[in-house]
Amino acid sequence: MTTPSRASWAEPYKIKMVEPLFMTTREQREKAITEAGFNTFLLRSEDVYIDLLTDSGTSAMSDRQWAGLMLGDEAYAGSRNYYRLEEVVQRCYGYKHFIPTHQGRGAENLISQVLIKPGDVIPGNMYFTTTKAHQELAGGTFVDVIVDEAHDSASCFPFKGNIDLAKLAAVIELHGAAKIPYVALATTVNMAGGQPISLENLRAVRALTKQHGIRIIHDMTRVAENAHMIQRLEAGHAHRPLRDIVLEICSLTDGATMSAKKDALVNIGGFLATNEESVFEEARNLVVIYEGLHTYGGLAGRDMAAMAIGIEESLDDDHMRARVGQVQYLGDKLIAAGIPVVRPIGTHGVFLDAKAFLPHLPQECFPAQALAAELYVEAGVRAMERGIVSAGRDAATGDHCRPALELVRLTIPRRVYTQAHMDVVAESVMRLHEARSTITGLTMVYEPTYLRFFQARFVRRPGA
Amino acid sequence: MRHRTIIEPFRIKSVEPILLGTEEERAAHLAAAHHNPFLLGSDQVTIDLLTDSGTSAMSAQQWSGIMVGDESYAGSLSWGRMESVVRDLTGFEHILPTHQGRAAERIIYGQLGGPGKLFISNTHFDTTRANIESGGATAVDIPIAEGRDPESEHPFKGNMDVAALERLLAAERERVGAVILTVTNNTGGGQPVSLANVTEVSAACRKHGVPLVIDCCRIAENSWFVRHREPGMCDVPYREIARRMFALADAAVMSAKKDGLANMGGFLALRDDALADECRNLLIITEGFTTYGGLSGRDMEAIATGLQEVFDDRYLEYRIRSTTFLGDRLHELGVPLMRPIGGHAVYVDAKRLYPQIPVHEYPGQSLVCALYLLAGIRSVEIGSVMFGTYDAAGALVPAAMELVRLAIPRRVYTQSHIEYVAETFEEVMARRGEARGLRITREPRFLRHFSAHFEPVG
């Protein structure tokens, strides 16, 4: 894998509007993290210096998107922003039908309710928290069919988002196609470290599912980033425009859920897309109950306007080169300093390998949760745990699910932070790495039923 | 001098064009929309009185909030602002943001409802009823008798029938999920609920240990009526009246798209810790994390500011008096109306306007189509299209009333727009004998009024 030269990712934009950052002292941060139960989700944004919690909804919009915001048509029914967005979704992604939702999980809720029956099995390229929760609420069970390399943080396999065709075939064999409403396919795979799927693999998955008459539902929240990796790393695609690859990826699937808060550069919004008339009809009946009338789906007209513009901007080759280039820059700095991170570097963040970072802590001491908390105390940098806390408990045994990957995600918001901010982050992680032996683990003192990572509370374990 | 003219307590800072089409163009649009104005494009509409929900003009202060919105995923400062404004207004400890009101309803009624449960309201609104019934529970309306009589001039026609409530609670206590007071009562004509009625309802609920939920999406408008119509309330500030109502309840749901003066957003407010925990779990799965609930930071800013602006004395005076202005003009023309005029809309009684159209041919929908054809005015039927059901034999069980709602968006239209609407009604009255009904040619399972198709009868 080639590292792009620094000049190649210079941002293809200049800054038009700024927002102040908050500087805090170590004492203030120590107090803030204690009050937040050592859960970075529970910190107040004013206590955070550099916020790498998520790339979701945190993008800087362009001046055109802000202009779109001003032109929002807030009519309850038939807003022109809806028709414009429908046209953009159809043209850029190729799906026939589209229903806006207030965000991605609204679309996940709809598709799970429409397609999943109790007892169904949904194979996918690694779970995602909210996706799995909706599948389970609808009575389904998620089965992981991602390639083994995805669970190995040190493997440098370039397409760790790929589906293992043998695993998928075995799941179909075991349960029968009738029990599988769809294959859940994510581009890129967030929980594996923002890893892409190759076009070759996707074509093979399409061929296999077609034989059995099984749908592919595409979690397309970072499809443009995935397409960029195909362009960069997969033989024969270097000269294809991003738009073209995105369209091909979508054409190999039957429907999609989209959180537009990632690729599409907006602060709120999502949609459900499908090529099937019957699924569309059913989902349109449900959307009025959960989200809003199907011509706004719980979104203000202005946010539909910003989304239509954001989708177009996300498919610009220069934009994407700078976006992924910035993430790679941070990753390469950390690799050069000997910090254990998930390899290769993904597209939306750098994932610290907490097991290797803190080898003295067993998984029961929540090493990734502890590392995220200590990184905040060290430098005011907010990251997110993606390990045993996020994985939740096994519904049958009640025990913790123990994922092979115990990660801390440093997620890079789009167009928000500069190279100097990335340097500060890298230095902070290096400082913490030097002091790693002083980090004690955590004890969980409050655990919610669903998606516990959002609200769980912890205390520090006493030092040795 | 004391002026009779009520002027807007603001001037216009930003405008949006509206399109003026011809009657021929509108006839084509209406046919393409299957005689359901919900299916019209907004650029085919001249005066959009479809709803007052999410259609307000925001203030300069709110737009500046849009610019400073903090889009942090967790712990956003804008959430901190909205939470403190809502907590201060409602007095409830737990505030959960939602992307709009129906999400707040779905979360709390999902927790309190389910198969066999019973919900009692002064009148359930369409999305509320759908939320409750899709979970397998039953929704029962018990407005006072005057609330069902379009001509009654009772000052608080939104009140709940307390005797009927007592009877239901005595007989069905175990089944009751919650008692819901919608203030003002939208379906019943935007009619207010008195503080005295809330007090009595609250006492009955507490006696039987049943939670009282206030649907507060128009509580500021309700407060105007309480202050001006209820004995002893004339010196109590609007905001204080609202606070007293909240103090009598156990929870509140709000669509901030009405009295929040926002284009998007809502919240659920709760007193009970355990219920709040359960609701937060559902919130995270279906809406978003607890500090944004599916809203952008900027929209939370706009709501925080809007909830403060809406209780301004001069704003409420303008708001209620300008709605009454349209009502009075139509009343003078002899248009049969829901009396007295409510807070956010004028409700025309289509059954009396078009006595020749039987209920199963939807007189309300006929008027909705006529207003669009004549003048590009978009309104909404609140009658048997919205609330009708079918019996076992497939015959229509009609709604109690056949109304057409002319909802006035907040701070959007001027007096001349309203004069244009009134003038259109002169024509409607002149041609009332020619009106024909419609039949439904296609309808979805839930909330059929949003997307049903119609064709004219005969």
Show the residue positions of the predicted features.
Chain A
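PLP-dependent enzyme catalytic core of the Aspartate aminotransferase-like
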Residues: 390-464
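Short, conserved charged micro-motifs
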Residues: 281, 359-367, 415-424
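Conserved active-site loop/cleft motifs that coordinate metal ions or position small ligands
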Residues: 99-100, 382-385, 409-411
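Aromatic- and Gly/Pro-rich donor/ligand-binding loops
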Residues: 71
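Short amphipathic alpha-helical segments
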Residues: 268, 348, 406-410
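Conserved small-domain helix->loop->beta segment predominantly found in fold-type I
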Residues: 295-304, 309-373, 377-404, 440-450
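C-terminal, active-site-flanking charged/polar segments
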Residues: 22-25, 370-377, 430
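Conserved PLP-enzyme active-site core in the AAT-like
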Residues: 2-38, 42-45, 51-60, 65, ...
